[in-house]
Amino acid sequence: MIFPFAVRLDGGGRMLDGAQGVYARSLARTLAERLSRPPRLQARVAQLTADGPLDGDDGAEGHGFIVASKAWTLEEACHVDLPEGTEYLLHGSAELTDRVRIRILLVDSPQKHLALDHVVLRPRQELFAALDEAAAEVAHALGEEPRREPWPTRDVEAYVAYLRGRDLSAAHEMGVAVPEPRRSFDPYLEAVRRDPDFADAQERLLALALSLAARGHAGAEAARSACCSLLALQPRAFKACLALAEIELLERNPRAAEERISRALAIEPGWAPAFERMGTSLLRQRRFGEAVGWFERALRGRKDDPAALQGLGTALAECGRVEEAMGCWRAALVSGVATADLHENLARGHLLLGHRSDARRHRTISRRIRGTPRFGLDLLRNAWQWLSNGPGAGR
């Protein structure tokens, strides 16, 4: 269990440099990820939050991440409650200015002794070597040999910007009130500006964009702007086109989504996940015949793609090919999908085929998943179907 590293505070109890809190959390997170590579090691990061501003007075109504003001003593560390199965606690202090300084304190919690006390001190431009050294020292203290994993970029300043972005992403994931969410993308954009091939920075920007877009129109506008900025920096970032398509679908604009997906496929024609999204955009435009071909193309790449199976089923049903549609929906059910919408589709399909008892069964399951009670017209419809077929009718 790795806790955010301590940073120095001024006489008023505030960090001497607010960025140091970001780097303390980020370096701890990075170290945990590097230590989780060997087969027998698995590190987890503890998240610390507290009431108060995240960044100045603008965030006073929200919650902010905190880091400790000093490294814990051995006695304090041994009294920290750890999750079951966790044997070691890693803590210390960190500083990232024109140099990297990390003090690592590795505590064997069951034995209540210090397994490692090591200081890493290197110039800022040797950040990657400093983190590799820290991970190696911890692994050796645990009797393991660390793997040498490549870094996602060799540009230190791009990586430092990326760390700031990771910290903001973590804040959004934990529900921390972040001032000016639109600016949460700036660190990732800086990382890509410094290293246009920094793929992980692009991926995390897009993940954050989709997360914010799902929260409402304001988030969608910020996400759309960030994706467009990424495309301006890296015109071949086809996944940014696909993220923009998702935003258009969320905003109920399938025609614009189709255009975005077409642009992505012009850059990367063989990207199979785009086939299903193209089918979905056509489906929402009620262009069912065209959608069938795209869903079938998606399933040639992955036969058990649940989204493609459900989409193909809907398109086929709208084209009057109900038996084939039922086959797709059943395959989606077998693949593990158990949504109310899928059971509702199965109920409608069974009803069209005259299988009324099966239709009632799936409608009941759909209602149970949605938490919808049986009353009024539902009871009347079921009673009428039962009377129409007789008490012994099965199909």
Regions of interest found by a model, annotated:
Residues 194, 233, 267, 301, ...:
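Structural marker of alpha-solenoid helical repeat scaffolds
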Residues 24-30, 34-174, 179-181:
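Catalytic-center loop of serine/cysteine hydrolases
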